[in-house]
From Swiss-Prot:
Signal peptide (UniProt feature, chain positions): 1-27
Keyword Cell division found: yes
Family: Belongs to the FtsP family.
Keyword terms: Cell cycle, Cell division, Periplasm, Signal
Function of the molecule: Cell division protein that is required for growth during stress conditions. May be involved in protecting or stabilizing the divisomal assembly under conditions of stress.
Domain Plastocyanin-like, first and last residues per copy: 229-287
Recorded name of the encoding gene: ftsP
Name of the molecule in the record: Cell division protein FtsP
MF (Gene Ontology): copper ion binding; oxidoreductase activity
Keyword flag Cell inner membrane: no
InterPro entries: Cu-oxidase-like_N, Cu-oxidase_C, Cu-oxidase_fam, Cupredoxin, FtsP, TAT_signal, TAT_signal_bac_arc
Gene Ontology CC terms: cell division site; outer membrane-bounded periplasmic space
């Protein structure tokens, strides 16, 4: 829909009237504190209770919207577990529709990943015991209900999951949750004039909104001490990719990707964050200057006025998070560590190659998801080369495995992408070296899928069987 001269004049007049500016636009200039999700930790074998239920949340100041969430809040608590633990989760579905949940990036056997075989009907529970045997990493949990994932994640069924180990404990980096170590969950929404999220599934592709949220609020700030600050970034949007940078041009120091630490920090001016992707960064706040993380150019006045008449995919504000330093510089501050891992990341030799094609239409390699069909069979403990192509740029994710990016459109990956991963942005072609460390079975397969959630719901999912070691 084009914006006519008459509509422009009408909207301009409306915008001058007090109280007539939509909340999503008027709130963009106001900053509120960053909500930090509560921390839920596994202790002495005690189970972690995760209740999926309706809740209320204020996306804009002065409003309350009906949402979904975990344990009574939009989104859910941050879960922290330790390598070597056996963690018992008790999911309880208190919604009026079926839900299945998964922890994306978790390295566990297929029966523990969730999915159709672990569907919870209303008032039902699921209580897996998860063996945590992987290295420290930032993961995330979310709904993965067939044909309903996009809507349910958009409604609020998601949260951050942290794995810690001896390496993460011993490194001289910030590790005090909510003090110098913060979860930053980025989403885009479309809010009506009352601050309530609107969701209309697009006819093709994935949903994109015009309002940027971090931990459920617009343009938040957080007060931090002078020194290093650690931000755990998660893109929990349905399909939007972000290009992040600091407002004053200072570098982002990337220390970790989807599956754990990089061998050494990588300093960048701009950082890509694809749907489902996680990255950890360090920001140097020792100079005492306020700084913001941003993600591109915001909507112009014409774009904002057009938003009165039609849904927009252009962000009203591109402000992600403002860091406000407080206090004095500590007498002793840690420098950026030269190394994060004691050894380089090793790679094996692939025993076979596969081609994966993500088309404009739903489906992978021309086939829609079929719960009764296994698309790929692999062997636990082996490596394969997967070449993934996409007709339209989108993120790609594989459950239950780790991979390394070998090349992107024939070129070497960026240094920040050279660690272990489970999610990758595909704009053309990427070559992956995939390691199958966990087994799965025909009734409990792993997924590989488009991380554009609407595309996955329409059938862009394949099923992976990993035969266990004899």
């Amino acid at each position: 829909m084009s914006l006519s001269r008459r509509q422009f004049i009408q909207a301009s007049g409306i915008a001058l009237c007090a109280g007539a500016v939509p909340l999503k636009a008027s709130a963009a200039g106001q900053q509120q504190p960053l909500p930090v999700p509560p921390l839920l930790e596994s202790r002495r074998g005690q189970p972690l209770f995760m209740t999926v239920q309706r809740a209320h949340w204020s996306f804009t100041l002065g409003t309350r919207a009906s949402v979904w969430g975990i344990n009574g809040s939009y989104l859910g608590p941050t879960i922290r577990v330790w390598k070597g633990d056996d963690v018992k989760l008790i999911y309880s579905n208190r919604l009026t529709e079926n839900v299945s949940m998964t922890v994306a990036g978790l390295q566990v056997p297929g029966p523990l990943m969730g999915g159709p075989a672990r569907m919870m009907s209303p008032n039902a529970d699921w209580a897996p015991v998860l063996p945590i045997r992987q290295n420290a990493a930032t993961l995330w949990y979310h709904a993965n209900t067939p044909n309903r994932t996009a809507q349910q994640v958009y409604n609020g069924l998601a949260g951050m999951w942290l794995v810690e180990d001896e390496v993460s404990k011993s490194l001289p980096i910030p590790n005090h949750y909510g003090v110098d170590d913060f979860p930053v969950i980025i989403q885009d929404k479309r809010l009506d004039n009352f601050g309530t999220p609107e969701y209309n599934e697009p006819g093709s592709g994935g949903f994109v909104g015009d309002t940027l949220l971090v931990n459920g609020v617009q343009s938040p700030y957080v007060e931090v001490s002078r020194g290093w600050v650690r931000l755990r970034l998660l893109n929990a949007s349905n399909s939007r990719r972000y290009q992040l940078q600091m407002s004053d041009g200072r570098p982002l120091h990337v220390i970790s990707g989807d599956q754990g630490f990089l061998p050494a920090p990588v300093s960048v001016k701009q950082l890509s964050l694809a749907p489902g992707e996680r990255r950890e960064i360090l920001v140097d706040m020792s100079n005492g200057d306020e700084v913001s993380i941003t993600c591109g150019e915001a909507a112009s006045i014409v774009d904002r006025i057009r938003g009165f008449f039609e849904p927009s995919s252009i962000l009203v504000s591109t402000l992600v998070l403002t860091l406000r330093p407080t206090g004095l510089l500590p007498l002793v501050t840690d420098s950026l560590p030269m190394r994060l891992l004691p050894t380089e990341i090793m790679a094996g030799s692939p025993i076979r190659s596969r081609d994966i094609s993500l088309g404009d239409d739903p489906g992978i390699n021309g086939q829609l998801w079929d719960v009764n069909r296994i698309d790929v069979t692999a062997q636990q403990g082996t490596w394969e080369r997967w070449t993934v192509r996409a007709d339209e740029p989108q993120a790609f994710h594989i459950e239950g495995v780790m991979f390394q990016i070998r090349n992107v459109n024939g070129a070497m990956p960026f240094p920040e992408d050279r660690g272990w991963k489970d999610t990758v942005w595909v704009d053309g072609q990427v070559e992956l070296l995939v390691y199958f460390g966990q087994p799965s079975w025909a009734h409990f397969p792993f997924y590989f899928n488009s991380q554009t959630l609407e595309m996955a719901d329409r059938g862009s999912i394949g099923q992976l069987l990993v035969n266990p070691v004899p």
